[in-house]
């Protein structure tokens, strides 16, 4: 199991990055809540990882903090939630937001996440409720403030943001509407994704 990587970021294309660790480039999928906090291309970063082994692929998922990975692991234990859906959930909400939604039984908020239907949302509430009690007292689930690093280059922020939403499970028409709704001149793709996800909840 690969649990942690430290190296230089050589590519960033939400929600994926490539990190060079001693000459080996690891492709890593990240939830957007972690992607926002990556340093710029060419800079070094530490990410916590979870390896998913399938018949047709080995997928490496990365997280800015341990508590994000902890929640990811809890999510994929839930019946009907695979790694890609867990990634979409963690992209739409921070650990603290998700914990609050579960503890307060906010079913509607959970069903707004792409791929989460009513049954899955109900299952999440049943299986995860109680696991987040006293989240303020445990540093496993404490929301830390990060510095947001702005990308130094911009191919086409809207297009990149749209592609990231598609990768997270949104339909093309929905993704385009979401980006159009929050688009502002000079915004990076990461800002557009963050605003689009925030506005959709």
From Swiss-Prot:
Asked if the record carries the keyword Glycoprotein, the reply is no
Query: InterPro entries annotated for this entry?
Result: DNA_helicase_Holl-junc_RuvA_I (IPR013849), Hlx-hairpin-Hlx_DNA-bd_motif (IPR003583), NA-bd_OB-fold (IPR012340), RuvA (IPR000085), RuvA_2-like (IPR010994), RuvA_C (IPR011114), RuvA_C_sf (IPR036267)
What family does this belong to?
Belongs to the RuvA family.
From the UniProt entry, list the residue stretches annotated as the region Domain III: 154-201
Q: Where is this region: Flexible linker?
A: 144-154
Organism from which the protein derives: Haemophilus ducreyi (strain 35000HP / ATCC 700724)
Q: What does this protein do?
A: The RuvA-RuvB-RuvC complex processes Holliday junction (HJ) DNA during genetic recombination and DNA repair, while the RuvA-RuvB complex plays an important role in the rescue of blocked DNA replication forks via replication fork reversal (RFR). RuvA specifically binds to HJ cruciform DNA, conferring on it an open structure. The RuvB hexamer acts as an ATP-dependent pump, pulling dsDNA into and through the RuvAB complex. HJ branch migration allows RuvC to scan DNA until it finds its consensus sequence, where it cleaves and resolves the cruciform DNA.
Q: Which HAMAP family match?
A: DNA_HJ_migration_RuvA
Q: What is this protein's name?
A: Holliday junction branch migration complex subunit RuvA
Domain of life per record? Bacteria
Offer a single GO CC term for the protein.
Holliday junction helicase complex
Its chief place of residence is cytoplasm
UniProt GO molecular function = ATP binding; four-way junction DNA binding; four-way junction helicase activity
Q: How does it assemble?
A: Homotetramer. Forms an RuvA(8)-RuvB(12)-Holliday junction (HJ) complex. HJ DNA is sandwiched between 2 RuvA tetramers; dsDNA enters through RuvA and exits via RuvB. An RuvB hexamer assembles on each DNA strand where it exits the tetramer. Each RuvB hexamer is contacted by two RuvA subunits (via domain III) on 2 adjacent RuvB subunits; this complex drives branch migration. In the full resolvosome a probable DNA-RuvA(4)-RuvB(12)-RuvC(2) complex forms which resolves the HJ.
Please give the biological process terms from Gene Ontology that the record holds. Answer: DNA recombination; DNA repair
Q: Which SUPFAM superfamilies match?
A: DNA helicase RuvA subunit, C-terminal domain, Nucleic acid-binding proteins, RuvA domain 2-like
Free-text note regarding domains? Has three domains with a flexible linker between the domains II and III and assumes an 'L' shape. Domain III is highly mobile and contacts RuvB.
What Pfam families would the database entry show?
HHH_5, RuvA_C, RuvA_N
List the residue ranges of the region (Domain I).
1-64
Q: Which residues form the signal peptide?
A: none
- Which subcellular locations apply to this protein? Cytoplasm
- Region Domain II: what ranges? 65-143
Q: Does the keyword DNA damage apply?
A: yes
Q: Give the keywords, sorted.
A: Cytoplasm, DNA damage, DNA recombination, DNA repair, DNA-binding
